[in-house]
C-alpha cells in the first residue's frame, strides 16, 4: 500500500509539471539602436529612456494555446551596453486590439495591464547584438487573441 501511495504522489507531482516551448515572433533581425524596448537617441548615447508598446496578434501567437503561462520574454537588441542602473518594467495584457495608432496614449495602453517584471537596477546586454532575456517575476496567463 505504501508503494502505491508513493507512486501516486510521484505521478501527481510529475503530472503537474508542464512542458515549455520557445515561440519566436517576427524575424528578430533589427539592427537599430532605437527599436525598443529601450530607446537610445544614438548608438553611443547615455540617454536611455522609453515607453514602448507592442501588439502581438492572434495570428502571430497561433502556436501558443489559450491558457498557456508565459514565464519569460526576450527581445533581440542591436549593439550597445547600458550598465548604469535603470528602472525597467514590463506590462502585459490580453485584449482584442489589432493596431496601435500614434494617438494611442500610454494611459490607454497600460490600462488593465499586469506588471510582470519590474526592476529599479536594470543593466542591459553587452556590446554585441543579441537576445535580452527577462524571466518574469509574475508569470502571465495568455487567454488567446491579442497580447499587448
Predicted regions and their residues:
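Aromatic- and Gly/Pro-enriched, solvent-exposed loop/edge beta-strand patches characteristic
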Residues: 79, 86, 91-148
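Extracellular/lumenal ectodomain signal focusing on beta-strand-rich modules
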Residues: 63, 72, 87-89
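Boundary/junction segments of secreted and surface-exposed precursor proteins
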Residues: 17-47
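Bacterial Sec-dependent N-terminal signal peptides
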Residues: 1-23
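A short beta-strand element within beta-rich, extracytoplasmic domains
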Residues: 67-80
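Surface-exposed, low-complexity/disordered Ser/Thr/Gly/Pro/Asn-rich loops and linkers
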Residues: 36-57, 81, 113-116
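Extracellular/lumenal carbohydrate-interaction signature centered on repeated Trp-anchored short motifs
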Residues: 63-69, 140-143
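Short beta-strands within extracellular/lumenal beta-sheet-rich domains
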Residues: 47-65, 130-135
Amino acid at each position: 500500500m505504501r508503494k502505491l501511495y508513493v507512486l501516486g504522489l510521484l505521478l501527481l507531482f510529475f503530472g503537474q509539471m508542464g512542458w515549455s516551448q520557445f515561440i519566436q515572433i517576427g524575424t528578430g533581425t533589427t539592427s537599430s539602436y532605437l527599436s525598443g524596448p529601450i530607446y537610445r537617441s544614438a548608438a553611443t548615447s547615455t540617454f536611455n529612456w522609453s515607453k514602448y508598446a507592442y501588439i502581438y496578434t492572434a495570428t502571430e501567437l497561433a502556436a501558443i494555446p489559450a491558457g498557456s503561462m508565459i514565464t519569460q520574454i526576450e527581445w533581440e537588441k542591436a549593439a550597445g551596453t547600458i550598465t548604469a542602473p535603470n528602472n525597467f518594467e514590463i506590462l502585459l495584457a490580453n485584449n482584442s486590439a489589432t493596431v496601435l495608432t500614434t494617438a494611442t496614449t500610454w494611459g490607454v495602453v497600460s490600462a488593465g495591464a499586469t506588471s510582470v517584471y519590474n526592476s529599479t537596477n536594470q543593466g542591459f546586454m553587452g556590446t554585441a547584438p543579441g537576445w535580452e532575456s527577462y524571466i518574469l517575476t509574475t508569470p502571465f496567463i495568455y487567454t488567446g487573441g491579442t497580447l499587448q
